[in-house]
Amino acid sequence: MTQPTTPDLILFNGRFTTLDRSNPTATAVAVSQGRFSAVGSDREVLPLAGPQTKRIDLGGRSALPGLIDNHLHLIRGGLNFNMELRWDGVKSLTDAMAMLKAQVDVTPAPQWVRVVGGFTEHQFVEKRLPTLAELNAVAPDTPVFILHLYDRALLNAAALRAVGYTKDTPEPPGGQILRDSAGNPTGLLLAKPNASILYATLAKGPKLPRDYQVNSTRHFMRELNRLGVTGAIDAGGGMQNYPDDYDVIQELADADQLTIRLAYNLFTQKPKEEKDDFLRWTSSSQYKQGTDYFRHNGAGEMLVFSAADFEDFRQPQPELAPGMEGELEEVVRILAQNRWPWRMHATYDETIDRALNVFEKVNEDIPLAGLNWFFDHAETISEKSIDRIAALGGGVAVQHRMAYQGEYFVERYGAAAAEATPPVKRMLEKGVNVSAGTDATRVASYNPWVSLSWLVTGKTVGGLQLTPQRNCLTRDQALSMWTENITWFSNEQGKKGRIQVGQLADLIVPDRDFFACPESDIADTSALLTVVGGKVVYGAGAFADFDESAPPLAMPDWSPVRTFKGYGAWGVQEGAPLQSVMRNAAANCGCASSCNMHGHAHATAWSSKLPVADLKGFWGALGCACWAV
């Protein structure tokens, strides 16, 4: 507690987990001028209210610091969000295809229907992708583009016509066009040896006009707020040129319409021109320029293309060029001389080892201490590399890519190799700066609770037990990875990440108790209330009337966001997609989930109005027809 000025906002009757070691729990907080001005008991905080203070009764619910994503492609994702049909969190291919059909029916020519990553075939009960025949049957005339992680893309016949791929199209560098016996493209594109063909093909699609991009970015932030995200570090991305592709996010920042605090890194765009990019950017941009809502965070995740080790575990580990070190050293010296931190994409330990050789060499001439540089991903990092990073004062930003690619990793390298991939717990034990994020929106979903679930349970979204319990994190550790730990990676330690007097007032009220709910429920969490800088940016249920930031309807009027909203198609009637596929399966299945005593009668049971009809309930989940036959 302190003696603050009259607060703008008080939240009370809650159960706050503050992450402040000197004051770990509270029931009330006060906010003044965007920062926490008091954290304590109701008895201490409520008397501070003045006539204009807004008060929100949390009704005994738990509250947490706002979640911060250490690696999110928000700027690029925001420009496209309103055009994309999201299969993130959809449990069955049957439902995914029903969504696709519904979107095809409302999408006008010449627009595409596009599913751009964020899902894996393993999340579906069918454990497969749609066939090209299925896509063509659903959409004979509307172009459909489906990106699966960064390993392949599926195009229907209409999409092949739209992009101009024919029998005469030459095989592109950085990819493979699968063809039939006559040499005609089938519609399957493979990322072999990298994803260049996937990027290039997607770029051929229509783009949203400028005002729609502004609206789209607001809706993407809104979806993140719904999931409890209050901040992120943007990692740049392919086809995201600076400053051209930053004008929309800058416009929103200038208009005070950002509902996510965003630190951004600059990603080089053209091979062999990386040095020129960073010479130009370090002379025209200043590290940390901006505000607490939108600020420059240095370089990366791409520093030089010769160091890019593609993360497709369905393909062999790539061999980096022998001249990589020279190109990387040129760029790192520029960054170190200008005191710009950097982040570097590195999937494999071999890449990390070679990059560390460069960093250690530069450190001999230009000390790297205090630069807060770090590696991204680091799935196969070794203990030796962890120690070298710690010695240089660096960090590791991990993401939940293995929750989406774990099955493929195990197929190629074996289950034992996946037990600590990446070795998050070991890095924490060694005291390395480490935090968590998603790498959304393509190679994984933007849902932070999927990441938190993966950190705690060690399971993929397909249910594979990837990480043994001894290598998993506690819920306290996982939450810190998504809050206070991330502030080192944006050089904002002490400014945010905790519910503590003086820190930025970013917090969430989740729809369940993160510390008490079953592990299997963590991934299904969303926010009832999200507060950024003392402003309610998302409110649902009992808190809907406090919402101050709802954007206008998604544009264009055929946008998938209008119908499906986002993760798990939550915009449709709650539970409807899962109920639909289960009932369809029940009518045709011969599964072994029936009651051993009373037999198998899914169709009868799940069509009834009795408790077995509730697929989320005990009896319905088991498939027992005891009460219905």
Model-derived segments and spans:
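A short, polar/charged loop-to-alpha-helix boundary motif
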Residues: 46-52, 516-519, 545-556
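Extended low-complexity acidic/polar segments
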Residues: 136-141, 285-294, 314-322, 388-405, ...
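Short, glycine-/Ser/Thr-/acidic-enriched flexible segments
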Residues: 16, 36, 44, 61, ...
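Divalent metal-binding segments
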Residues: 2-12, 17, 21-280, 295-351, ...
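Charged, amphipathic alpha-helical linkers/stalks
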Residues: 553-559, 564-567
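Acidic (Asp/Glu)-rich catalytic clusters
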Residues: 252-256, 282-294, 333, 366-368, ...
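His/Asp/Glu-enriched, well-ordered alpha-helical/loop segment
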Residues: 333-343, 347-373, 377-378, 383-387, ...
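C-terminal, active-site-flanking charged/polar segments
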Residues: 249, 509-512, 522-554
